[in-house]
């Protein structure tokens, strides 16, 4: 995961303009960005802190307060050569899917596994060629290096290799 500085507009009802307004803005920003994914930042996992409140205006339609806020956030952006840890969530003869933080699934194609692993069709697991105790099964935690990623329809599609 990375730490990224993001600038965003946050709407806040007037009832939240009290002595804890910064905490209310932080809570609303976390709520608004939950499950958000953009090509620029990737997945916003959690907003850590507000760095600056740049601007404030009142919406003419509904009188909500609109703040332009710069904040620091933990992000997950799957780009080539980045390494992530995740657990195996699906195994097929054609490859393995790794789930990273319940946000991103990464496909490890079978051709990247064939030098080190054999697929056991009966048990749906990959078994190490040199070490039969080295098993890839659902729930196994692995480190994965992204080899390719593409952003489309508010999500990333990723390929990777085990590191």
Where are these regions (language model features)?
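Single-stranded RNA-binding regions, centering on S1/OB-family and related RNA-binding modules
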Residues: 1-163
């Amino acid at each position: 995961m990375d730490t990224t500085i993001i600038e965003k507009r946050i709407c806040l009802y007037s009832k939240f303009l009290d002595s804890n307004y910064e905490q209310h803005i932080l809570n609303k920003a976390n709520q608004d960005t939950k499950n958000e994914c953009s090509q620029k930042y990737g997945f916003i996992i959690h907003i850590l802190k507000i760095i600056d409140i740049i601007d404030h205006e009142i919406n003419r339609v509904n009188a909500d307060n609109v703040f332009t806020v710069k904040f620091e956030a933990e992000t997950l952006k799957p780009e080539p050569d980045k390494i992530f840890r995740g657990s195996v969530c699906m195994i097929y003869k054609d490859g393995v899917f790794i789930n990273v933080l319940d946000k991103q699934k990464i496909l490890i194609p079978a051709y990247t596994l064939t030098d080190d692993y054999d697929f056991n069709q009966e048990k749906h697991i990959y078994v190490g060629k040199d070490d039969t105790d080295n098993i890839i099964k659902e729930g196994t935690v692995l480190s994965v290096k992204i080899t390719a990623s593409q952003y489309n329809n508010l999500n990333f599609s990723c390929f990777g290799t085990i590191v």
